[in-house]
Curated annotation (Swiss-Prot):
One of its GO terms (biological process) is RNA methylation. One of its GO terms (molecular function) is rRNA methyltransferase activity. It is found in: Cytoplasm. S-adenosyl-L-methionine binds at C259, A260, A261, P262, G263, G264, K265, D283, D310, D329. Pfam families: Methyltr_RsmB-F, NusB, RsmF-B_ferredox. InterPro entries: MeTrfase_RsmB-F_NOP2_cat (IPR049560), MeTrfase_RsmB-F_NOP2_dom (IPR001678), NusB-like_sf (IPR035926), NusB_RsmB_TIM44 (IPR006027), RCMT (IPR023267), rRNA_ssu_MeTfrase_B (IPR004573), RsmB-like_ferredoxin (IPR054728), RsmB-like_N (IPR048019). The keyword Cytoplasm applies. This is Probable ribosomal RNA small subunit methyltransferase B. GO terms for cellular component: cytoplasm.
Length: 447
């Protein structure tokens, strides 16, 4: 067996993720780039890494009865057992014997015969005896958390906020890989024509479920195609596309995107403005500001001005009442995108949301004076955590009586999401439409 077998590459990626706490989506991109893989093997690698990572707690629960002294087992061997068990329990297309054989071969090369024998023994025992049932866990929250590999505290938080049934739906949909969605650049393309052109070139696509400029990519990737390179489409989740619609920017207006990287929402705003007016896009990190500029260049958008700046100091640079509309797409816990970044389930802590809420509120406080009277302030996050969403907005409006909920938000959003809009706020949970979890709140400045 060659060192570069797909399973060995997957194991190497899992080891790096565990050691470096790297983002899974970024690491996987770099691993794919550095290994020459066929489309089929690229798909298998993605499946193995994401699947093993996404089901880590469940896999450890299944492995536990078969490992006598887990503290003595090397971390890479645990990763190998998880990877192999994932194939045995979750991937019907891979025969158990193939998964076990590959695991033993990898163990021989990476370790020695003793480790190979141990790996073989554990996996053969599982094959013979079967894994323990999750039904043995009496507490329903703990059972759900274990079966769907979420931290127990997080499942409890969702159950308290939305009810146990909704928490279960959130957890289960997180285990289903998301489809890639594209936003059509209406400055350069028409969605209906683009769908026909893509189909003619063998790209499997269909209309999006929510946004009028959305296209669902059913198979393959878009980044290397001329559609992407020529700026006809951008990669963006449908719930994220609703943010610019909520802001509702018009041509010739002055808009601020206070936390803009990597630039998808800034670009959408500029497209809706027909590339007329001004969009100032801020981000704290210089390398991320570069991404905003690159996105604008690719899409042919000249009204985006990207600057490196902490939004919490924006008042030092900009005038009061300078902007018609401001978007604060705030840094957040990101629980709405767990399907795309499964590793975050294991790295986040219960007090993260309270810490982030302070940052979010401080950004809103700094930005508030910059909105013109009668102007719009939209706050959004990709999380379902009420501490970062409703509680932040409640605190902000209490402190700033010159802002009020924008009750016209509902009319600006697609019909399907309107029933979920309350008091100028929209909370999308991932199971509603199969999109990322997202929170959007629109406020008007009185006067």
């Amino acid at each position: 067996m060659k060192k570069t077998s797909v399973r060995d590459i997957a194991l190497e990626a899992l080891i790096k993720l565990e050691q470096n706490q790297a983002y899974s989506n970024l690491l996987l991109k770099s691993v794919i780039k550095s290994n020459e893989l066929s489309d089929q093997n690229r798909g298998l690698l993605t499946e193995l890494v994401y699947g093993t990572l996404q089901n880590k707690i469940a896999l450890d629960y299944m492995l536990k009865p078969f490992i006598n002294k887990p503290q003595k087992v090397k971390p890479w061997v645990i990763q190998l057992l998880r990877l192999s068990l994932y194939q045995m329990e979750y991937l019907e297309k891979i025969p158990d014997r193939a998964a076990i054989h590959e695991a033993v071969e990898i163990a021989k090369i990476r370790g020695h015969k003793g480790i190979a024998s141990f790996v073989n023994g554990v996996l053969r025992s599982i094959q013979r005896e079967g894994v323990p049932s999750f039904d043995a866990i009496e507490d329903p929250v703990r059972r759900l958390a274990t079966e769907t590999s979420h931290p127990e505290w997080l499942v409890k938080e969702w159950a308290d906020a939305y009810g146990f049934e909704a928490a279960e739906k959130i957890c289960r949909i997180h285990l289903i890989p998301p489809k890639q969605t594209l936003r059509v650049n209406q400055m350069k393309a028409d969605r209906a024509e683009l769908l026909d052109q893509m189909a003619a070139e063998g790209i499997e696509v269909e209309k999006g479920d929510l946004a009028e400029d959305a296209v669902k990519l059913l198979k393959g990737t878009i980044a290397g195609t001329h559609f992407f390179q020529n700026g006809e489409v951008s990669i963006q989740d449908e719930s994220s596309m609703l943010v610019a619609r909520a802001l509702d920017p018009k041509s010739d207006e002055t808009v601020l995107d206070a936390c803009a990287a990597p630039g998808g929402k800034s670009a959408h705003i500029a497209e809706l403005m027909k590339n007329k007016g001004s969009v100032t896009s801020l981000d704290l990190h210089k390398h991320k500001v570069k991404l905003i500029k690159e996105a604008a260049d690719r899409l042919g958008l000249t009204i985006i001005h990207a600057e490196t700046m902490d939004a919490r100091k924006a008042g030092e640079t900009f005038e009061n009442e300078q902007f018609d509309r401001i978007l604060v797409d705030a840094p957040c816990s990101g629980f709405g995108v767990i399907r795309r970044k499964p590793d975050m389930k294991y790295t986040k802590k219960p007090d993260d949301s309270a810490r982030l809420a302070e940052i979010q509120l401080s950004i809103l406080r700094e930005i508030a004076p910059l909105v013109k009277k009668g102007g719009t302030l939209v706050y959004s996050t990709c999380t379902m955590d009420r501490t970062e969403n409703d509680e932040v907005i409640h605190a902000f409006i209490q402190e700033h009586p010159d802002f009020e909920p924008d009750l016209s938000l509902e009319k600006r959003l697609p019909e399907k999401v309107r029933p979920f809009v309350r008091d100028g706020r929209l909370q999308i949970l991932p199971h509603y439409f199969g999109t990322d979890g997202f929170f959007i709140c629109s406020m008007r400045k009185k006067g």
